[in-house]
Amino acid sequence: MKIKTRFAPSPTGYLHVGGARTALYSWLFARNHGGEFVLRIEDTDLERSTPEAIEAIMDGMNWLSLEWDEGPYFQTKRFDRYNAVIDQMLEEGTAYKCYCSKERLEALREEQMAKGEKPRYDDRCRHSHEHHADDEPCVVRFANPQEGSVVFDDQIRGPIEFSNQELDDLIIRRTDGSPTYNFCVVVDDWDMEITHVIRGEDHINNTPRQINILKALKAPVPVYAHVSMINGDDGKKLSKRHGAVSVMQYRDDGYLPEALLNYLVRLGWSHGDQEIFTREEMIKYFTLNAVSKSASAFNTDKLLWLNHHYINALPPEYVATHLQWHIEQENIDTRNGPQLADLVKLLGERCKTLKEMAQSCRYFYEDFAEFDADAAKKHLRPVARQPLEVVRDKLAAITDWTAENVHHAIQATADELEVGMGKVGMPLRVAVTGAGQSPALDVTVHAIGKTRSIERINKALAFIAERENQQ
C-alpha cells in the first residue's frame, strides 16, 4: 500500500507554528515510507478565507521547504463533486433533507440545555413523510447510525471510542447549496486516497462523524493520528503574547528554516537524547509511536539556541542566501565590502539571529555618521592619539592585506610603544567600527578594508583633536 498523507489548512490566517508542526509530521511520515504528501486548502469558509492567507500558507511551506507531491487542491473548486456525492446519498437514504427553521432549532436547543441535556438535533425530519415544495429552503443532514459505536486506533493515543448515540445528524449541505467542512474533508480524503490523517487533537471529535460518512459511502477509512496542542512556556495555549506564532514572523525575526524545523520536530517527538537533526535524519527516524500524547511547551530560548547552532554549522554560503533578505530590509548596500559568506563567518559567534547580524554589520559596508558616545568618551581620548597614528602608518605600509598582517601591525604598535594590546586595540576598534564591540579586531579591520580603515582612523584622530580644542 502506498502511504499518502495530507496537510489541509484553512486559509483564514497565517501559517502558525502548530500548523507547521502538523505539516512537518505529515511530510516526514510520507517521506519515511516513500509515500506522497498532498497540500489541500480547505477554503469552504467563504467569509473568512482570503487570498492573502492562502499566499501566507504557501510562503510558509516554501520557506520551510516542505514540498508537496500533489496540489494545492482547493475545496471551493470541488463543490460539484461534493454535491454529486450528497445527491447520491439522498437517493441511497444515507442522507435526508431537513426543513426545520432556525427558530425551531434554537428553541429545541434552549429546551435541551434547560433540562441539562447535550444540545442535538432530534431527528424530526429524518422520520417525516411531509411533502415539501421543491424550492422550499432546506439543509441536508447525514443519517448517522443510531446504534453501536465508532472505534478507531489513534496512532498516537491508542483506541478511542464514541457511542453513536452521542452523535447527532450532521448537516452536510447548507440552505445555500454549499457543502460543509466535515463532509468535504471526507470526500477529499476518499478521492485523494489519503491513507494516514495526521492532524491536531482539536479534530478528535470530528473523526467519528467522518468515519461514519466514509462507511456510508463504502469508502476506505484512513488511519488517524492526533497530535497534542502546543502551549507557551507558562502552560497556557500558545498565543501572540508568548512571542511570534506565524512561521513567516520567525523568518522576519532572523531564524533559519532548519532551526525552526529542528525545533518543531522535537516539540512532541524524540529519538533518544538526540537534539540536532538534519532533514535526512528526521526522515529516517520519524515514527508516529514516538510522538508524545502530552501537550508541548514552546521555549523560545531553546529555538534561539538552535538558530545560533545552525548559523555556525551550515555552510556560510547557504546562510548568506538567507541573510541577504535581512540585509535588504535594513537597506544596506553591500557592493563595497566583504562577501556575505565572509560576514557570516565573522559575526556567526556573536549573533543568534540573522536579523541581529544584519543590524550589526552596517559599518562593514557604509561609513557611520558619528561614534558611539560612551565608547568615544572612554577610548577616543588624547592618550589614544599616538597609538592610532602609529597603527595607522603600519596598516598603510601593509602590501599583502591579510588578517594575519593586520594582527602583526597592531601587535607591533603595542610593542613599539611598550603598552598593552588594549591601549591600541580599543581606540582602533572604536575608530574603525564606531562602537566599542566587534568581532576579533584583526579580522574586522581586514574585512573593512585598508583604505576605509585608514580613512576612519584619520576621522577618529580629527575627532580627538576637535574635542581637545573644545576643552
Curated annotation (Swiss-Prot):
Stored Pfam families: Anticodon_2, tRNA-synt_1c
Keywords: Aminoacyl-tRNA synthetase, ATP-binding, Cytoplasm, Ligase, Metal-binding, Nucleotide-binding, Protein biosynthesis, Zinc
Gene3D superfamilies (UniProt xref): 1.10.10.350, HUPs
Location of the motif 'KMSKS' region: 237-241
Residues that, per the record, bind Zn(2+): 98, 100, 125, 127
An example Gene Ontology molecular-function term: ATP binding
Cofactor note: Binds 1 zinc ion per subunit.
This protein's GO CC annotations: cytosol
Location(s) in or outside the cell: Cytoplasm
Motif 'HIGH' region mapped to chain: 9-19
Catalytic function, reaction form: tRNA(Glu) + L-glutamate + ATP = L-glutamyl-tRNA(Glu) + AMP + diphosphate
CC cofactor: Zn(2+)
Entries under SUPFAM superfamilies matching the protein: An anticodon-binding domain of class I aminoacyl-tRNA synthetases, Nucleotidylyl transferase
E.C. number(s) listed in UniProt: 6.1.1.17
GO BP terms in the entry: glutamyl-tRNA aminoacylation
Complex formation: Monomer.
Entry's family note: Belongs to the class-I aminoacyl-tRNA synthetase family. Glutamate--tRNA ligase type 1 subfamily.
Annotated function: Catalyzes the attachment of glutamate to tRNA(Glu) in a two-step reaction: glutamate is first activated by ATP to form Glu-AMP and then transferred to the acceptor end of tRNA(Glu).
Protein's recorded name: Glutamate--tRNA ligase
Protein encoded by which gene: gltX
